[in-house]
């Protein structure tokens, strides 16, 4: 709506007024609520801002802070010019006017990231303020603050209860059609790099390697790379596995620029309730697309307007079991002699040497489970690797064999136990599928978020923590239980190894990459 000025404006001020009015970024309600002296005057809020407000350092909306903008662009206020008009003319289409603690990203990227965060179902502005009470509510855009300051400062940006409710809603939702995110016959990049951080978790390296192999099987030119690669020599398309880890460790920080991120695909492996997931949020929200190891998480990114797909790599025929050099490792020497030889994943349930195995880090939820059931487990032949992790499981001499050890032990185990780190029930694909099912072990798990391929009581067995001992006792000690276990074990192996399933996954991921690659920037 046009403003009829009750007082004379200079030609420059009149042009400024028209520029601001046309942008739609002046928030009259905000201006009047914050500057109540203007509300009591007879001058319209926009006219007041153009004539007086910008000279007094007043904000025209929640996002534009004149002092911050002038620190970044000192010339914007030269000759008594309005810095907000400079912003509108220089950064058209943006609503964020400063970089906060993310100086290596363009304002255009940050604006997209903040708007996407607003739509992400895990984020609620009022809840972010409730968690971070030191933030001034009236003058702050919560999504902008969360992206530019909250994540870099290590603040929590999602509420735990709301994350739980959102996951439940995502499980119940119909979801968006995969066909909207797949271009079967579209263009693909000439070269692709799948990146992992060499200083990070060794399991992430495995996922990245499997993804790279799957992309090659899809007919794409793909190479496995790490953070030590020269960014100037990067392939046409970069896929960063575990961005919460890659961009925070060592030389990975050199890759955290808007120029790289906006054209890349992120492969998210982290759970939404964790601080690690929140650390990866800026890279996920400003990327060209997201691949997620969790079906529900992919749906959440789609709801936020991001091209996203749920995908897990094919698992090849080769297995990475213990090597000769691993045999002197302390955790290998405690294995029974019969379990030190190379396992055969096709060994039937009844013929395996270990009854139950578990690999995982310490958490309060797991601590309660194992303390409560210690007496029960003591009667079986177990291998439990359970410790407090303060750093990633990396390639150090202490940790290097652990990934191979987990697969090796699962290859000798009847049952692989899956106890969640907390109460969220995330489907831990690497532990459940890659680590256990692919090595012929039967997974007994607490209830998980629904998975589109692997179903409870078909490919794995699911029970509440309280009744898991009863289920295990039935599986190990009764003919009916052993028959059911073998049925489940074989069904899981078929789901992993059937060539048609693997070809379908290849077609799907190629189609998604083609969709992202051939979709023009907004």
PLM features: what roles do these ranges have?
Residues 189-226, 278, 295, 302-303, ...:
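Catalytic binding pocket for nucleotide-activated donors in carbohydrate/polymer assembly enzymes
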Residues 308-314:
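Short hydrophobic/aromatic-enriched beta-strand-loop microsegments
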Residues 267-269, 358-361, 460:
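Short hydrophobic "strand-cap" motifs at the C-terminus of beta-strands
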Residues 296, 315-318:
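Carbohydrate-associated surface elements
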Residues 176-183, 191-306:
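Extended catalytic core of nucleotide-activated donor transferases of GT-like folds
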Residues 319-415, 476, 482:
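Conserved catalytic-core segment of nucleotide-activated headgroup transferases in glycan assembly
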Residues 1-177:
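Charge-rich, low-complexity intrinsically disordered regions
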């Amino acid at each position: 709506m046009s403003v009829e000025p009750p007082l004379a404006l200079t030609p420059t001020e009149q042009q400024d007024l028209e520029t601001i009015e046309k942008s739609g970024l002046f928030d009259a309600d905000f201006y009047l609520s914050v500057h109540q002296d203007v509300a009591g005057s007879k001058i319209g809020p926009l006219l007041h801002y153009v004539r007086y407000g910008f000279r007094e350092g007043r904000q025209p909306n929640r996002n534009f802070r004149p002092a911050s903008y002038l620190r970044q662009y000192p010339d914007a206020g030269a000759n008594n010019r309005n810095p907000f008009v400079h912003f509108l003319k220089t950064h058209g289409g943006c609503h964020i006017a400063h970089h906060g603690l993310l100086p290596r990203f363009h304002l255009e990227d940050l604006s997209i990231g903040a708007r996407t965060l607003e739509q992400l179902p895990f984020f609620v502005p009022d809840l972010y303020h409730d968690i971070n009470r030191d933030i001034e509510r009236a003058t702050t855009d919560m999504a902008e603050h969360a992206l530019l300051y909250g994540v870099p400062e290590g603040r929590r940006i999602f509420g735990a209860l709301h994350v739980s409710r959102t996951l439940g809603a995502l499980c119940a939702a119909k979801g968006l059609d995969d066909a909207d995110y797949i271009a079967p016959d579209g263009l693909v990049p000439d070269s692709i790099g799948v990146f992992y951080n060499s200083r990070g978790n060794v399991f992430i390296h495995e996922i990245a390697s499997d993804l790279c192999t799957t992309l090659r099987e899809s007919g794409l030119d793909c190479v496995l790379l790490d953070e030590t690669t020269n960014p100037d020599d990067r392939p046409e398309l970069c896929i960063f596995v575990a961005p919460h880890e890659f961009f925070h460790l060592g030389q990975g920080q050199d890759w955290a620029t808007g120029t790289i991120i906006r054209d890349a695909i992120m492969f998210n492996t982290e759970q939404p309730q964790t601080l690690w997931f929140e650390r990866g949020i800026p890279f996920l929200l400003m990327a060209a697309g997201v691949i997620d190891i969790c079906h529900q998480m992919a749906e959440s990114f789609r709801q936020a307007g991001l091209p996203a797909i749920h995908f897990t790599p094919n698992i090849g025929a080769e297995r990475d079991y213990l090597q000769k050099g691993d045999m002197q490792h302390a955790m290998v020497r405690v294995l029974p002699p019969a379990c030190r030889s190379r396992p055969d994943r096709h060994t039937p349930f009844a013929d395996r040497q270990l009854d139950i195995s578990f690999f995982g880090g310490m958490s309060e939820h797991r601590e309660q489970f194992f303390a409560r059931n210690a007496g029960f487990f003591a009667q079986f032949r177990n291998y439990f690797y359970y410790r407090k992790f303060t750093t990633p499981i990396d390639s150090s001499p202490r940790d290097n064999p652990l990934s191979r050890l987990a697969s090796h032990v699962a290859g000798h185990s009847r049952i692989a136990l899956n106890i969640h780190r907390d109460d969220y029930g995330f489907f831990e694909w690497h532990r459940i599928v890659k680590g256990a099912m692919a090595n012929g072990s039967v997974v007994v798990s607490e209830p998980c978020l629904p998975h589109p391929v692997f179903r409870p009581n078909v490919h794995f067995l699911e029970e509440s923590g309280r009744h898991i001992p009863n289920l295990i006792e039935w599986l190990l000690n009764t003919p009916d239980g052993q028959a059911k276990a073998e049925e489940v074990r074989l069904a899981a192996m078929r789901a992993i190894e059937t060539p048609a399933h693997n070809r379908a996954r290849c077609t799907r991921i190629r189609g998604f990459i083609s969709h992202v690659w051939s979709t023009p920037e907004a």
